[in-house]
């Protein structure tokens, strides 16, 4: 009941966002009015969803920017999970109380793009307020997610990530496995997971983000279409098509291993992290953005490796796709506030700022210069994990199946997939019927979004 209520609240808020933005957008644009010079520092409110070490590093960036000048004060405000933060931003905008900057996860990109007049495009912001802005300094695989077909960036990539495999090297040793040879293929992975379970662990493996990692990235890594129209990049009239024989085999294997207690389900989003950090399982799938927190919480030696692949899948491994979030700017602010936001975004894009953020958190560097600076500093010699993620993301030139995903109502679609996955584990529905249900109910949400944005 709780998940159904959450799903309904999210649906109503997203519908309110897209339809309500139309009515509020003109008023918001007109709200950028001339005002007298501020008598003190201008506060820039920055809503985010970061926790733990990542939240500390958000605050660090704000503090560092604030120390460079006296005109603006960037104030980070934690608003809960990604979905909580997005929903809070929707509600705040409709109440004319929107923050200046909001962190929105990648599944909300299509919704934000459709909200014309409610958000101020980053490329326009930087141009209007005198910032040197060169889109080519950013890594294309990342920025394409947040840009128009003309290459115009609508939001600033911030905590970009991709999914990787974490493994407990100490547990590998105990199970008689080579700690320097993590599994490369899925058949190898499942056999190692069974050995970890047999060695005395509570389970062999777990995973976060069932949709993002085991459906979306799984499809991209195997060069399979997740949806039509280049996964939504080429039009709103797209459909989900991920219920392939390969995906069916993959999910049936995991479902069976759940019955055998080799796979342990830890919950939605990133709720499975404690199963790995506490040593209950030896293998785990999570964002590279979890690297800093694992470094802080794991009391054992762990490694980072690429996602496994099925060797009989043509073209695999391909490349993974990004997750994480970008920073969007709301309309309706003063010119002084926009100048402060533009200055802050320029600060965030500096190689030194990006390299620090990347090295402290594990999130991907969004600029080539930050990556090169990190390499020159010898960071990867002692911390190879984050570079595994970068090389995996850039493994091959993206195809229409692996360039990313851009669907409307995608946060709702993910909630549908989470619920069906839990029903599969609970024995309420077969894997085959469950995947079909994910696709059919997800496609219904795509049609709703398409009708609303014709």
Residue ranges and their predicted role:
Residues 37, 123-138, 182, 224-249, ...:
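Short, solvent-exposed loop/beta-turn-alpha elements that line the ligand-binding surface or hinge
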Residues 63, 67-68, 75, 91, ...:
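Extracytoplasmic/periplasmic substrate-recognition and gating elements
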Residues 64-140, 174-176, 184, 282-283, ...:
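Extracytoplasmic "Venus flytrap"/periplasmic binding protein-like
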Residues 91-92, 99-100, 131-171, 203, ...:
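A structural signal for short loop-to-beta-strand junctions that line the ligand-binding cleft
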Residues 105-164, 190, 216-221, 303-306, ...:
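Hinge/lid segment of periplasmic solute-binding proteins
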Residues 147-158, 163, 173, 187-239, ...:
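Extracytoplasmic/periplasmic solute-binding protein
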Residues 190-196, 235-266:
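Glycine-centered hinge/linker elements that transmit conformational signals in sensory
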Residues 321, 385-441:
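C-terminal capping/gating helix-and-loop segments adjacent to ligand/active sites or protein-protein/ligand interfaces
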């Amino acid at each position: 009941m709780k998940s159904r209520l959450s799903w309904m609240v999210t649906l109503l808020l997203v519908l309110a966002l897209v339809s309500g933005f139309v009515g509020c957008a003109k008023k918001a644009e007109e709200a950028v009015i001339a005002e007298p010079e501020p008598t003190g520092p201008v506060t820039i409110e920055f809503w985010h969803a970061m926790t733990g070490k990542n939240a500390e590093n958000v605050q660090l960036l704000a503090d560092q920017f604030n120390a460079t000048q006296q005109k603006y004060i960037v104030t980070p405000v934690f608003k809960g999970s990604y979905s909580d933060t997005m929903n809070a931003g929707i509600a705040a905008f409709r109440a004319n109380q929107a923050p200046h900057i909001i962190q929105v996860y990648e599944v909300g990109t299509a919704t934000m793009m459709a909200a014309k007049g409610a958000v101020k495009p980053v490329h326009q912001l930087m141009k209007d307020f005198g910032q040197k802005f060169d889109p080519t300094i950013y890594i294309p695989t990342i920025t394409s997610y947040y840009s128009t077909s003309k290459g115009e960036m609508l939001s600033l990539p911030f905590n970009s990530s991709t999914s990787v495999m974490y493994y407990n090297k100490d547990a590998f040793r105990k199970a008689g496995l080579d700690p320097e040879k993590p599994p490369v293929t899925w058949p190898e992975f499942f056999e190692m997971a069974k050995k970890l379970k047999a060695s005395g662990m509570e389970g062999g493996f777990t995973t976060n983000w069932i949709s993002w990692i085991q459906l979306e990235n799984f499809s991209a890594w195997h060069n399979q279409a997740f949806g039509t129209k280049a996964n939504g990049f080429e039009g709103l009239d797209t459909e989900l098509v991920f219920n392939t024989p390969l995906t069916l085999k993959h999910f049936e294997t995991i479902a069976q291993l759940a019955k055998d207690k080799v796979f342990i389900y830890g919950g939605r989003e990133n709720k499975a992290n404690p199963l790995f950090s506490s040593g209950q399982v030896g293998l785990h799938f999570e964002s590279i953005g979890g690297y800093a927190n694992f470094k802080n919480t794991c009391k054992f030696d762990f490694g980072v490796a690429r996602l496994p692949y099925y060797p009989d899948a043509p073209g695999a491994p391909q490349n993974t796709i990004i997750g994480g979030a970008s920073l969007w700017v709301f309309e309706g602010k003063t010119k002084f506030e926009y100048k402060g936001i533009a200055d802050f975004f320029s600060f965030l894009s500096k190689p030194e700022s990006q390299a620090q953020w990347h090295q402290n958190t594990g999130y991907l560097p969004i600029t080539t210069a930050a990556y090169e600076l990190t390499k020159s500093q010898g960071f990867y010699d002692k911390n190879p994990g984050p570079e595994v993620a970068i090389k995996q993301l850039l493994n091959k030139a993206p195809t229409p199946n692996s360039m990313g995903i851009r669907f409307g109502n995608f946060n709702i679609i993910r909630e549908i997939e989470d619920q069906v996955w839990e029903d599969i584990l609970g024995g309420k529905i077969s894997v085959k019927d469950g995947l079909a249900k994910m696709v059919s109910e997800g496609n219904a949400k795509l049609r709703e979004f398409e009708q609303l944005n014709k």
